[in-house]
């Protein structure tokens, strides 16, 4: 680790990864580095992991310098737990993960957490797709553990989130993001979606190799929010009937290397993002 122009730079096998200058670093909630984590769980274990996670792994992770952005049930995959966490920089990520996974809380609960899982290595490392595209959680308030426990009827939990993952050719992320911002974002808003964030692959070397990430991926990810599942269904119907949206898809999705993935997610009681 060296210093150049008041910035930290990692010497990696690919290209140096410059950190955001401290004086211009965005607020902590904006998370310039984001992990999208998808866990495959043993059948019937999702509620067990969610209860453990929301009780033991939220404040304790944030105490090390990361932000627990959102935790979700995947409506189409009952054995999947999806969550997002963010960091101020790749250096902060290394320090925070080292502190948490080397600390007493993970040591106390890792066996119980790991007992619910088949695979936890499906992880995409991301950065905001354009200035201002990161998550703004400044107005969000996380329920306490006690408040969350009183929300026994999950169907009444507010919020619905859609994550779309677009797989692109190497080097195509920036151009795709520019076109998406200019042409797709207005269409999403016009049809009832709230764009919560947009991200592209972060190609810096994994600074915490103990936890693998999907290296070599070239993705663009859009995260949209809705009031509830009915609002999302109405949005999908409106998009399907929109000639303008079809034109956007035909023009800009053509460069994808495979069909986009769509995750339909409901937030857990303690998710900030919803």
Predicted regions and their residues:
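Short acidic/glycine-enriched loop/turn segments that link adjacent beta-strands
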Residues: 76-79, 204-205
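Surface-exposed interaction/gating patches
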Residues: 36-43, 48, 130-133, 139-207, ...
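Short hydrophobic transmembrane-like helices used for membrane targeting/insertion
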Residues: 9, 20-23
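Compositionally biased, intrinsically disordered low-complexity segments enriched in Pro/Arg/Gln/His
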Residues: 4-7
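An amphipathic, aromatic/His-enriched active-site/gating alpha helix that lines ligand/cofactor pockets
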Residues: 25-29, 48-70, 76-77, 86-129, ...
């Amino acid at each position: 680790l060296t210093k150049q122009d008041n910035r930290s730079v990692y010497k990696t096998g690919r290209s140096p990864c410059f950190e955001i200058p401290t004086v211009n670093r965005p607020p902590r909630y904006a998370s310039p580095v984001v992990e999208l984590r998808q866990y495959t769980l043993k059948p019937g274990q999702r509620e067990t992991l969610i209860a453990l996670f929301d009780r033991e792994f939220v404040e304790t992770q944030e105490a090390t310098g990361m932000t627990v952005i959102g935790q979700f049930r995947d409506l189409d995959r009952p054995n999947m737990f999806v969550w997002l966490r963010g960091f101020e920089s790749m250096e902060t990520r290394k320090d925070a993960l080292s502190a948490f996974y080397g600390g007493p809380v993970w040591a106390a609960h890792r066996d119980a957490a790991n007992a619910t899982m088949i695979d936890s290595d499906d992880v995409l490392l991301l950065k905001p797709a354009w200035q201002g595209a990161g998550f703004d959680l400044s107005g969000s308030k996380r329920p306490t553990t006690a408040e969350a426990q009183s929300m026994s009827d999950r169907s009444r939990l507010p919020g619905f989130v859609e994550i779309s993952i677009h797989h692109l050719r190497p080097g195509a992320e920036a151009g795709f993001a520019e076109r998406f911002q200019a042409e797709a974002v207005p269409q999403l808003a016009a049809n009832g979606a709230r764009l919560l964030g947009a991200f592209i692959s972060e190609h810096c070397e994994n600074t915490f190799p103990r936890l693998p990430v999907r290296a070599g991926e070239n993705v663009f990810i859009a995260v949209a929010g809705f009031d509830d599942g009915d609002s999302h269904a109405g949005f999908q119907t409106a998009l399907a009937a929109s000639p303008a949206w079809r034109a956007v898809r035909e023009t800009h999705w053509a460069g994808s290397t495979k069909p986009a993935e769509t995750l339909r997610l409901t937030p857990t009681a303690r998710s900030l993002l919803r």
